[in-house]
Amino acid sequence: RGKFKEICERPDGSCRDFCLETEIHVGRCLNSRPCCLPLGHQPRIESTTPKKD
């Protein structure tokens, strides 16, 4: 595998310096920038929800 990209924990998220008002902060990218997910894609993420794999 080649170079490191700005990879978000969520596949449809995007890495930026700060999230827009229409986005939710969902995690961190490899370069420690926030990972932002546009609102409306899915319900608000609850930390109490167990993950199913």
Curated annotation (Swiss-Prot):
Disulfide bonds join C8-C35, C15-C29, C19-C36. The keyword Repressor does not apply. It holds the Pfam family Defensin_beta_2. Has antibacterial activity. The keyword Hydrolase does not apply. Belongs to the beta-defensin family. This is Beta-defensin 108B. Residues 1-2 form the signal peptide. Keywords: Antibiotic, Antimicrobial, Defensin, Disulfide bond, Secreted, Signal. Transmembrane segments: none annotated. It comes from Pan troglodytes. One of its GO terms (biological process) is innate immune response. GO terms for cellular component: extracellular region. It is found in: Secreted.
